[in-house]
Amino acid sequence: MPIKIPDTLPAFETLVQEGVRVMTETLAIRQDIRPLQIGLLNLMPNKIKTELQMARLVGASPLQVELSLIRIGGHKAKNTSEDHLLAFYQTWEEVKHRKFDGFIITGAPIELLPYEDVTYWPEMQEILDWTETNVHSTMNVCWGAMAAVYHFHGVPKYELKEKAFGVYRHRNLKPSSIYLNGFSDNFEVPVSRWTEVRRADIEKSESLEILMESSEMGVCLVHEKRGRRLYMFNHVEYDSTSLSDEYFRDVNAGVPIKMPHNYFPHNDPALAPQNRWRSHAHLLFGNWINEIYQTTPFDVEEIGTDL
């Protein structure tokens, strides 16, 4: 089954061209199926690019998915027009009465700030608490993952001496995990962050388990043993050119930045990078969506009573 998104969303045509099955609202109504309700809390400045990245992965599932785009109410986006936000987004205040089968919280370029100094931290805490009663399963990504694991488990973040930046080998630590079904023993994942969480702090919580890790970059994916929260600290959703875009953005702005590790062919920025993580990104999100489908209540309004 395809993903249901507005026909006029910029990602629509791109997804069609890529072979992702997308569905208009008219066609969705004709199918007698309850679509999985997936919310995307998009905290990134370039919301359109992030919409496409996440819709691409969620939409690859054989299940019908309805994606709702959500933003922080009082926060003004720097790189996305107000017209786009008004046309396609709802604020969390506008959707907090709803129940969601799945909910994605993205990263945000604010990781060097203490959590309490983030202007929308109080609302973020409300949203995280709300997910416990209104969301069946949550996928937290990069800063969203760090914020969530700090909020729920007190796991701190640490500033790195230099940006973790590139494509790194990671190990599958639990092949029997439902979320890692079909994963290789080791694989590559894009990394782009200024902070990290550490294994020792994760291990202090009996309810957390590390599923993916890199000998160079540390913890990558964590899940809750008795819950339905995933914490992805890196960027499996990235496009082939995402790291390149970040690199040249900083170079052109005169910001000191090292070339992304293990990314450009022959370490030559003039050569187009190859995507070596796409299949595992689809596996992770596909496994997540499938697990939601297997465990979520048939009546979406019963979410929160099933824990």
Swiss-Prot record:
Gene3D superfamilies tied to this protein: 3.40.50.880
Protein name as catalogued: Homoserine O-acetyltransferase
Classification via SUPFAM superfamilies: Class I glutamine amidotransferase-like
Alphabetical UniProt keywords: Acyltransferase, Amino-acid biosynthesis, Cytoplasm, Methionine biosynthesis, Transferase
Gene Ontology biological-process entries: L-methionine biosynthetic process from homoserine via O-succinyl-L-homoserine and cystathionine
Organism: Rhizobium johnstonii (strain DSM 114642 / LMG 32736 / 3841)
Pfam families xrefs: HTS
The family this protein is said to belong to: Belongs to the MetA family.
CDD domains tied to this protein: GATase1_HTS
Site, Important for acyl-CoA specificity: residue positions: E111
InterPro entries per UniProt: Class_I_gatase-like (IPR029062), HST_MetA (IPR005697), MetA_family (IPR033752)
